[in-house]
């Protein structure tokens, strides 16, 4: 049975996520940076607890293990690995004097390549990064600076796996003292290996992790009532810098919009109805795109319904497998004329 809204839901969610990336100027690299839920407060907070634990449990980190254990008898790949195929490396930012700017975008550049760590040996990864640095900054002082930062970043990862396991889980709960100690160790390591670059690389991340840890402590405090917990959580959030608060509000609005859109689709609201209801959350341009995707999906559903009816007629002929496949493929090509439509129909036929 085909789920009517599965494709458009997926596309809308992707569109919203990509929109957030463009607006915020952030390159999300999920193998490198574990995401922490920033949604509405759940007083039990089980998922946030798990995510924070993943961030500080460095002994099992894919990035650190990968960089430290693979052989080095490899050369730079002649083509981009599959994980980077079809993409372009982010630009390395410069300041007004031509030096490498001390901003988080430099880490975004390196993390872009680290998404390919499972496809390359450390030596090949190093060659790939060096090649792109030269390509972007050849002959400048920023080239030397970028190479030095990359070396420091790799040193950070190589030392990260050597940090002791602090036993951050007691039974089925987090040991908040151990988690705090682990965060302190990572912050200290970042300063030792990256120096002045530790702040642009990890400052915001460390602030978020410590904030999430404080939320967990409040949520876990059995001496507090639910009302007291909510008040303390609000007070804690108000201590965040205004820019961080604004970003959290924006992310929450986008999450709310995704939930609302999915519900509107389940309720079979028209595309224009969806646009009117989400324009306040997303703005007119994105709301229009969402409505247009919904409209195109309705057109697709009608096409597929027509195609499925004709395919049933082919099935009823009990043809030889080869002849059956030829006729079905011809039917697809005749009905689905836009790029990717025939492939989508074939996937639904499985």
From Swiss-Prot:
Membrane topology: Single-pass membrane protein
Location within or outside the cell: Cell inner membrane
Gene Ontology BP annotations: lipid catabolic process; protein folding
GO MF term list: unfolded protein binding
Pfam family, one: Lipase_chap
Record keywords, A-Z: Cell inner membrane, Cell membrane, Chaperone, Lipid degradation, Lipid metabolism, Membrane, Transmembrane, Transmembrane helix
Key word Phosphoprotein present: no
Keyword Transmembrane helix (UniProt): yes
Residue stretches spanning the membrane: 12-32
GO CC annotations on file: plasma membrane
Similarity remark: Belongs to the lipase chaperone family.
HAMAP family noted in UniProt: Lipase_chap
Function: May be involved in the folding of the extracellular lipase during its passage through the periplasm.
NCBIfam families: PRK01294.1-6 (NF002338)
Name assigned to this protein: Lipase chaperone
The species this protein was found in: Xylella fastidiosa (strain 9a5c)
